[in-house]
Amino acid sequence: MRWPPWASDTQAQQQSRKSSSEDDERQAAASSTTTSKKKDWESSVTAIDWAAFTEARTIIPTLILTSGFLGAFYIHRRYLRRFPDAVSITPSYFRRRSLLGQVTSVGDGDNFRIYHTPGGRLAGWGWLPWKKIPTSKKELRDKTVHIRLAGIDAPELAHFGRPEQPFAREAHQWLTSYLFGRRVRAYIHRPDQYQRAVASVYVRRLLDFPPFRRRDVSYEMLKRGLATVYEAKIGAEFGGEAMERKYKKAEWWAKLRGVGLWKDYRRNKTKWESPREYKTRMGLEEAAQPGVEIKK
């Protein structure tokens, strides 16, 4: 306010200072109030409401999501995990579980390769665009499981400089026509020293009678005289004593009828040679050559 002309300068100055001091106090009080409100707001924002984590609306969805994730992981690891080769098969499969796959090649009368298709058609193999089974050798390289049929020994084809055994080609051709391109189930017993999985293999075929009946491939070969019962004392796998007796009975019946490799057995017993005897003889002949491994 304006002071009268007769007022002294000292009174005017005192009043001005008093007014200025009051303004400063009001501003300080307002600033303090604002700061306090800001701190209260920040505290409310950053504070953790621990009680909310114990409420049912929080616990139930969390349990459902966690259980679903763990369940999906377990199912994938146990049922949908694909093995690219025999070396990758975990020990939990040996003598307990099986592999489902499609036969991509047949190397001999008692071994072949499958492309592992866990879950089969139910998991999309063969009809989903991203689950097609490769067909070319380049695509299949390092992606197939090498299977050795359990319980049998088929005649040897010519390889590693060794001559072909009688009925080796017939056994190979039959196994190729019986399995190539088909889905098989292999019950894994163990791995062998050649990075193969020794397995009892079963297949279902439309043209068999009765159709789609599960067939034991090893048994079918023994019955037709295309293989002998595995004779090695170490490393023999049959899938149990009952299967061993069944295989020996099938071999005895084929020998009695003189079918397949048993055709000339009675007339020429002294020169007849089983696959086991053939490999033993070849091994003895190659004993002088270091680094040569005898195939089992």
Curated annotation (Swiss-Prot):
Catalytic residue list: R148, E156, R196
Family statement drawn from the similarity comment of this UniProt entry: Belongs to the LCL3 family.
Protein name: Probable endonuclease lcl3
Any Pfam family hit: SNase
Gene name per UniProt: lcl3
Organism: Aspergillus fumigatus (strain ATCC MYA-4609 / CBS 101355 / FGSC A1100 / Af293)
Sites where the protein binds Ca(2+): D153
Endpoints of the signal sequence: none
Membrane topology note: Single-pass membrane protein
Primary localization: mitochondrion
Annotated stretches, region: Disordered: 1-36
Residues in TNase-like domain copies: 97-264
Coiled coil (UniProt feature): none
InterPro entries named in the record: SNase_OB-fold_sf (IPR035437), Staphylococal_nuclease_OB-fold (IPR016071)
Keyword Hydrolase set for record: yes
Biased composition (Polar residues): 8-18
Location within or outside the cell: Mitochondrion; Membrane
Transmembrane stretches, start-end: 59-75
Keywords: Calcium, Endonuclease, Hydrolase, Membrane, Metal-binding, Mitochondrion, Nuclease, Transmembrane, Transmembrane helix
